């Protein structure tokens, strides 16, 4: 996978065959960062991190810090290996259950979540993620197209992928 924009444009991050995740497609990633616009100096939380491409792209585009949370040891090992390419960047790693992490986390400017396909606790995830946002923060959920119990302020669809956005305020 390749970084599309910013200081690390063109840099390739390693992925694994038969990975326990599905990376965000190039088109969805470009659209996400076009929507967010300037993320310079912001801190971002990447839940269900998988390949980490969203967090690494955010760093390349000027994010101040990225925090990866994934419960898989294999995923965390790959994230740490890829982070070596991003020298001197502030990157945090947590091998943890997302809900346990959200109970005690700091606040973030952006929280991105791309849960597994058959994840059935999205309605539980949304309010917990929103509660960990800074006052003007945005929570972004990547999923298959669907509706949620908490109304978002924006929804963008890309074939069988949907980006749904919630603001704290």
Label each region the model flagged.
Residues 1-169:
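Class I S-adenosyl-L-methionine-dependent methyltransferase catalytic core
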């Amino acid at each position: 996978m390749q970084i599309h924009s910013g200081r690390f444009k063109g840099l390739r991050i390693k992925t694994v065959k038969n990975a326990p995740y599905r990376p965000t497609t190039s088109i969805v990633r470009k659209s996400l960062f076009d929507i967010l616009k300037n993320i310079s100096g912001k801190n971002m939380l990447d839940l269900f991190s998988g390949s980490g491409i969203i967090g690494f792209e955010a760093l390349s585009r000027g994010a101040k810090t990225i925090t990866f949370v994934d419960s898989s040891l294999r995923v965390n090992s790959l994230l740490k290996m890829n982070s070596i390419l991003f020298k001197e960047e502030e990157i945090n790693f947590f091998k943890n259950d997302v809900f346990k992490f959200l109970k005690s986390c700091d606040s973030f400017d952006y929280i991105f979540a791309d849960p597994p396909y058959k994840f059935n606790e999205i309605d539980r995830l949304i309010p917990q993620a929103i509660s960990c946002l800074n006052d003007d923060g945005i929570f972004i959920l990547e999923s298959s197209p669907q509706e949620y119990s908490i109304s978002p302020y924006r929804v963008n669809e890309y074939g069988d992928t949907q980006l749904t956005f919630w603001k704290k305020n």
